[in-house]
Curated annotation (Swiss-Prot):
UniProt keyword Transmembrane present: no
Organism of this sequence: Desulforamulus reducens (strain ATCC BAA-1160 / DSM 100696 / MI-1) (Desulfotomaculum reducens)
Disulfide bond positions: none
PANTHER family: CELL DIVISION PROTEIN WHIA-RELATED
Pfam family, any one: LAGLIDADG_WhiA
Designated name of the protein: Probable cell division protein WhiA
Length: 322
């Protein structure tokens, strides 16, 4: 099961303690996934479609709890793609259904919503704002597995509703943005801290902990990778330097013989040939008294300069300081 599905299953079990919060959450769910059917004699019925069984059960429970109307759940099987079940929560035409439309800002006689965005009365309190956000996420949201890229989004087909969702999230200091995607509008968050705050607002506390643990693990893994890469780079640099030093020393040995070098350079060359993998510090400790790392490096550089001169065609007439 995806991280997004696990998060939705958790949120589907969250029940608002106040009627106003339950109404706000239901309004968001219907706004995201609901559609109105009109039959003869202007009889209205309401269908709410979701692919998540837990969300369907929540919609059913909220409708029964808030309005007490006859409600049914139908299951349909998709015939394409992943062939997931589709759950349809249906409220058939009956007396009292107008109360649902009224609560959502829908007038049956006009065949349209009086407010394309969020009905402001539904989110008058902070608790209701959080509940509406939870409902919107359950109805059209998703969140990436935190082991990958950080991304949370809510998709709606209404531009005004998308903008209202952005403003709702910004009210809670979440820097949400909206982007068009074909015939849809995507409200999204990118930062890990922002997503954690959003999960907390919606009361997805278990998902939040899983997200945080995955983020910490990912951070540690990335840090280890950086350290390993750094160590590898340093090791490669050291190995390349040692190889170059050995090449210079062998060149001098073949060209003029190491015995013609001044004693400090001769000893340095011989120690390097004897200990090709040793660091400069380790080489320096072979002398009595020990020679510092900078001193060994200075001698190595003299050997390198001499080898370069001889490679350029110059004759060797004894070692002279530059």
């Amino acid at each position: 099961m995806s991280f997004s599905a696990v998060t939705k299953n958790e949120l589907a079990r969250v029940v608002g303690s106040k009627k106003c919060c339950r109404m706000a959450e239901l309004a968001a769910l219907i706004k995201m996934d609901g559609s109105v059917q009109i039959s003869g004699q202007k009889k209205f019925s309401l269908n709410i479609v979701t692919e998540n069984a837990a969300v369907a059960r929540k919609i059913f429970t909220l409708l029964k709890n808030l309005f007490g109307l006859s409600t049914e759940i139908m299951v349909r099987r998709k015939v394409r793609l992943r062939k997931n079940n589709v759950y349809i929560v249906r409220i058939p035409a009956q007396p009292g259904i107008e109360e649902i439309f009224k609560a959502l800002g829908f007038q049956a006689g006009s065949f349209s919503f009086t407010e394309e965005g969020i009905v402001k009365d539904l989110i008058a309190r902070d608790c209701c704002r959080k509940a509406y956000l939870r409902g919107a996420f359950l109805g059209g949201g998703s969140v990436n597995n935190p082991e990958g890229t950080y991304h949370l989004e809510i998709i709606t087909d209404n531009q005004k509703h998308a903008q209202d969702l952005v403003e709702l999230m910004q009210y809670f200091q979440l820097p949400a943005k909206v982007s068009p995607r074909k015939n849809w509008y995507v409200v999204y968050l990118k930062g890990s801290e922002q997503i954690i705050d959003c999960l907390n607002l919606m009361e997805a506390h278990s998902a939040l902990l899983d997200f945080e643990n995955a983020r910490i693990y990912k951070g540690v893994r990335n840090q280890v990778n950086r350290l390993v890469n750094c160590e590898t780079a340093n090791l490669n640099k050291t190995v390349n330097a040692a190889v170059r030093q050995l090449e210079n020393i062998k060149f001098l040995a073949d060209r003029i013989g190491l015995e013609k070098l001044p004693k400090p350079l001769k000893e340095t060359a011989e120690y390097r040939l004897q200990y090709p993998d040793a660091s400069l510090k380790e080489l320096g400790e072979l002398w009595t008294p020990p020679v510092g790392k900078s001193g060994v490096n200075h001698r190595i550089r003299k050997i390198e300069r001499l080898a370069e001169k001889l490679r350029s065609g110059k004759e060797y007439h004894g070692y002279k300081e530059d």
